[in-house]
Structure formats: C-alpha cells, structure tokens
Amino acid sequence: MSSVLKAFERFTIEQELQDRGEEGSIPPETLKSAVKVFVINTPNPTTRYQMLNFCLRIICSQNARASHRVGALITLFSLPSAGMQNHIRLADRSPEAQIERCEIDGFEPGTYRLIPNARANLTANEIAAYALLADDLPPTINNGTPYVHADVEGQPCDEIEQFLDRCYSVLIQAWVMVCKCMTAYDQPAGSADRRFAKYQQQGRLEARYMLQPEAQRLIQTAIRKSLVVRQYLTFELQLARRQGLLSNRYYAMVGDIGKYIENSGLTAFFLTLKYALGTKWSPLSLAAFTGELTKLRSLMMLYRDLGEQARYLALLEAPQIMDFAPGGYPLIFSYAMGVGTVLDVQMRNYTYARPFLNGYYFQIGVETARRQQGTVDNRVADDLGLTPEQRTEVTQLVDRLARGRGAGIPGGPVNPFVPPVQQQQPAAVYEDIPALEESDDDGDEDGGAGFQNGAQAPAVRQGGQNDFRAQPLQDPIQAQLFMPLYPQVSNIPNHQNHQINRIGGMEHQDLLRYNENGDSQQDARGEHGNTFPNNPNQNAQSQVGDWDE
C-alpha cells in the first residue's frame, strides 16, 4: 500500500511539471502585425517632449488602429533611454509582432507632423495619417489634451531635467495602470488613487502633469489588449529587479511599482500557503487535506521551476496560472480563509466567498485561529529564553484579549457570505492600514466571485455557528439568493426554485448555492458528487460531479 501512495504522490507532482516545454523553445509561428516604433537618436529634450505628447495622443486617438497604439506605447516607455535603438530590441523578442524602427529627426513647428530621418521607412501618406490621428482625440477628452491642465502640452521644455520630470510623471501613471490591467481592470480606481498619492508624496509624480482619468483608462485598455506591450513590460520589470542599490531613477521607480504587479492573479495560492501551511496548526493533519497538501507541494515546485517569469503569469497570459486556481484545492483553501479572516483584518476586503468554498472547513479555520492565537512556538520561545511562567503569561494575555476582543479590535463571528462593507469594521486606530489590494485579482482564472447586489447572508448565532433558519428578507434579491436549510421551520414555501449546495454526509449546512436561472427546478449537487433534489423526502442518488476552477 505504501508503494501505491508514493506512486500517487509522484503522479500528482509530475502532472504539474510534465507538460512544460524546454526553456527558450520557439513556438509555431503565426501571422504577425507590423508595428512602427519611433526612435529619436538625439537627447534633445524638446524633441523628446514633443514625442511624449505625440504618443499620448496616438494612444487616445479614437481612430487609431491597434498597431498604432502598440507602437506608441513601446515608444513612450522607451523615451527615458539614452539609446532608444538598443532599448527597443526588448520588444523584438515577442513572437506576436514585427517591429519596424522609424528614426525621427523632429516635428514641424506648431504641429505633430513627423520629420523622418532619411533611413526611416515612412511615406508621405503615413506621415499625414499620423498627424491626423494625433489631432483626432475623442470627445471624452476635455480641452483637446490628455492632461488635466490644458497648458501643460504647450509649455517649453529645453532642459533634460524638465523632460525627465515630465516623462517620469507620465510613465509612472502608465505603470500604475499596468497593476490592474489583467486582473481587476473594471474595478473602482481606489487603489490607483492611493498609489498616485504615494508617488506624489515621494516626489516621483508631479501633480501638474496628471493625465485625465479617461486618458489613463485608454492607456490601460491598450496595454490590456496588447501582448507585445506586456511582454516588453515584463522584460523591463526583470531588468528593474536585477538592479542594485545604486540604480537610476527610472528603474528604481519601475522596481517599486513592480511589487504591486508581481504574483497578481496568485493571491489565493499565496494566502493559502500563508494561513494554512505557515501557521502549522493541528487541523493540517486531517485526512481530507492529504491529497490537497500534495497538490500544494507540486504547485510550489512548479512555481520554482517556472523561474523568474513566474511572478508575471497574469501579465504574460501564461496558461500555467490556471494550475494555481483555488478550485484545485478547495478544502484547504476554505480552511486558510477561515484562519485569515481571524488573524488579518485586511482579509475582510478579499473576496473569498467562491462557489467552491466549503463552509464546514471555513468554520474549522475560524475556530482553530480563535483557539490557537495564544499558543507559543516553543522553538522561538527557546531562542528568546522565555521561562515557563513567561510563556503562560503570554498565552493568558492573548486569550484574555481574544475573549474580550480588546478596544478597537473587530469581534463577532466571521461570515464568508456577508459582503465586506457589511462586516464589522475596525476602529479608527486601524484606518491607516492599507486594504488588501488583490480583491478580485484571480476571479478570471478560478471563476470565483462574491455575492453581489448587497445580498444579506443568514444571521449568525453566538459561537460563530451559522443559523440558516428563515430570516426576514430585505429585498427581492435576497429572496432569490437564499433559502433556509430546514423548510419545516421556515416561513418560505418549500417549492421555491433554489439550489442548496449540501455537504455530503454532514448534518449542518454551511454553504448555500442558488439557481442562477431562477426559472426551473434544479437539483443541488453536493461537493462529493451527491445529488440532492428539491424534495427533501426523496432519497439522494450518487452522481459524479466536477469541481469549479
């Protein structure tokens, strides 16, 4: 039997690793679009500032093609480079497009009509077309300029320092748009505003050169649609990571923003490692976790084998990101989320109420975290030289605060089905703690989403146990989402068209699932493949089910 178990463990690990090709292998070639990238060979600040504004206008132009925007973005991100010709070679590595370099000597006075170099492959018609695109801004752009201040674009720029201040102020806004371009691009821009405020405080972003929100949105959309640009930005992020303490201003800025971009789309995986494996509490010994612990081990090996680019799987649209979706390890994910909601107040802003969240194991995590908060790590205590009396004192202190919940510490049971805005909020002492940024970052790959439209969860009894008996419903949306586990004590008729996701073999119901169609009776499928019809008197029948990913 032991040999079978070892073979199963090896099989699980090899499943994650065997599909990878050799590093550096060239994929089959597909059709490529021609992208014209503009190169300025002189350090003239006036010409480079005009090119900066020209690229912004091309990106925001309402009639520009995708290739025009891609070329403008690559040119924009290359402007701080002393040798643009060499820097743009980073984009040549992309198998998605054919990069054509066009050397530019400047612009005609008072216009955005390009003056090409003799070596530039630009026709007169193309030059005229680019000039028209630069003037063709959409009506959503106010004052005929991408900037908030209308006079910024026409200001003289005759010093390198002036150009760098303006260029970095624009580029830092573009980099902030990269942070959410693949994971939560349609979410409110609260995190972007906080980052803008941070960089203004650091002196990296001058408020006078802020772009209009519509211009920022168009930049983000162009980056999201172009794999060539995102591959180019990934190379830039890797260059920034390799820099030492004595780095130039631009790559220090890119390295700082890169911390927000790294591991986006993998938040559920890293939170599971942090709160499930990192705590090392006794529920990890449950037999139900054995297979999923092997899965996590294989994922950690896969992440290590992917190398430096593993941090940017979402930015590169890498298919390996699907392997890290929490739908592949739902039980230990549910347990980790329960632990995290107790230990970390910022977890209240993370959407962990996924369709596959197991309420039973979530509650195990909650209760374990509450009971184990006062335990002492003996190895650390030995390193600190704590006496048995001091260890007991620490345990009693934490237990006393956990029972009383202290001043300003959010208490009460944690319910995964209540939207974060309706959870009990911390006191003012915690208002300066930044929110957990990646609230919806991996929704695309695992299909998870929290309850929307302000739906209320069932009431919670003392001790953290959910009471699924009928509660007064506030609006019709709640009536569609929730129904009680025990219809005989409910004031809701038994024949309503709802689904119950019931844990096979368990007496209590911890997770509800609803009928999205709402127009026909459907059977509810349990987590172990059992089908439970809407009629509670009918016997359950075995049926093979699949998990959500």
From Swiss-Prot:
The gene is N. Keywords: Capsid protein, Helical capsid protein, Host cytoplasm, Phosphoprotein, Ribonucleoprotein, RNA-binding, Viral nucleoprotein, Virion. Homomultimer; forms the nucleocapsid. Binds to the viral genomic RNA. N0 interacts with the phosphoprotein (via N-terminus); this interaction allows P to chaperon N0 to avoid N polymerization before encapsidation. Interacts (via N-terminus) as N-RNA template with the phosphoprotein (via C-terminus); this interaction positions the polymerase on the template. This is Nucleoprotein. It comes from Mumps orthorubulavirus. GO terms for cellular component: helical viral capsid; host cell cytoplasm; ribonucleoprotein complex; viral nucleocapsid. Ncore is globular and carries the regions required for self-assembly and RNA-binding. Ntail is an intrinsically disordered monomeric domain in the C-terminus. GO terms for biological process: negative stranded viral RNA replication; negative stranded viral RNA transcription. Transmembrane segments: none annotated. Residues 437-469, 517-549 are annotated as: Disordered.
